[in-house]
Amino acid sequence: MFEYGIRPTGVLHVGAHQGNEISTYRKNGIKNVVFIEANPSLASGLRDRFTDQPDVKVIEAAASETEGRATFNITSFDQSSSLLPLKEHARLYPKIKVDHSIEVRTARVDDLLVEEGVDFQAIDFIAMDIQGAELMALRGATNCLDNVKALQIEINYKQLYEGCALITDIDEFLAKHDFIRVHTQTPYSETWGDALYVRRPMVGCTSLGKMGRFANSLFQYMFIHTYARDMDYTPVHQMWSGDDIFNVIPGTASPPILPNKCEESGYEFIDSSITGDPKPRPACDFSGFFQYQTRYYLPHQEMIRDHLTFKGIYAERCNQIRALFDAQSGPVITTHLRRGDFGTGVFFIAPEGWYLDWLSTLRKEHPKLSVYIASDDLNAVKSAFSDYPLLTEADLPKSELAHDFATDFIALTQGDAMAISNSSFSFAAAMLNTRSKLFVRPVLDRERLESFDPWNSSVLLRGSEAEDIGEHVMSKKAVGKSKHRKAKLKKIFKWR
């Protein structure tokens, strides 16, 4: 339970028997304990035992879903006593028989706690062992469950008692209250055992919106939501630009602080400290870029595309772009030419000529094609494409979008074919483009555009760097630094 970030402070123990678990509770620093016991003789013993412990309450009643009176079957082995008649239990344990039956009060747990003046907020853990009547008791404890973080419940795979709930029934009920079963043990028989349920753990990504730009945030969002879905956890994160643009589950201004931390330093599966580790990481705050080879995200393609559907004024902008593209006489090829901060390392500048070579081949099949250019330095690249009908953001109605990059991103998702940069921005747009059947990207060491599958490729190609190839794929700033470095090395070796 501790691995889920849960450290109980108050316990409700239903089916207390002799209350021997008190030592375990005290050892773990739990002060507030409420015992509920239906057997009058056992309840009396509990009251005597804990009479000098004011933080222990003993309630005599059979926990159920209704107030009333019911028959309680006391067996020769009193731990098997139950509201329900023996069934499979009689076959498995023939020496244990019903010794006698008595009438007891049945009551909802919620009502019993109110009667005794127990603050629901003081109870965050429930232990329940009432011989097949667990679901009845849970149905009467729905208010109490609101504050509970974990439950340990006796479960049945067969009806040991007539009409008793099976483990699947318990799972279904508690799932409706946002609990999941995380551990099950059956040490004595395959027909029954104990299960630990915890409130669906949260996992977070506090780096989302803080670590990199829009596309980095987009991949962080994809990761935390796909990981949470795989593990059946609840994702939490801050607000980010995608909250305005997409049909996402929005972030919160102050997400909860989670006790566990995990930093992802790898880019591929083989380097990842997360994707190859089957160990669950509940109550964990993840940080990293999570730009894995995208087959990792493929099983969740439908969910991702649903979350990343444009909404509001961004959906309207998409409609404007769609109308512009549909008005052209042929297919529209959306291209992304990243300049600005590119020109060093793996973020090389792909020359316009690589795109022109590819377009000239494509135009043989589609002579009426048009080219939409998305670029952070449009004036520097536009003239190279003068031989083609060109489209840019300037051809669209003016807008006052809060996120000025959104028009180009949306346009990239609408292309009939798509040529990207070695950029997570246009790669992410390719993942959302459902129209195109042809995607190409610049491959540095081959100095050309090559086809790729957006849902089965590395987000960034890292095999070569701009400095390895030459100045034509470097920025002026990077070239200057490179020349300075070479000159400095030359002096050093000359001096030596």
Residue map of PLM features:
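A short beta-strand-loop structural module common to alpha/beta enzyme folds
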Residues: 35-39, 233-243
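Donor-binding and catalytic core of enzymes assembling or modifying cell-surface/extracellular glycoconjugates
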Residues: 364-457
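Short, charged/polar "capping" segments at the starts of alpha-helices
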Residues: 41-45, 160, 242-247, 343, ...
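Nucleotide-sugar donor-binding patch of glycosyltransferase catalytic domains
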Residues: 427-496
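Phosphate/nucleotide-binding beta-alpha loop and adjacent structural elements of enzyme active sites
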Residues: 1-202
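A short, glycine/small-residue-rich beta-strand->loop->alpha-helix junction that serves as a flexible
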Residues: 209-219, 344
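Short, conserved active-site loop motifs that form the nucleotide-linked donor/cofactor pocket
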Residues: 56-57, 389-391, 464
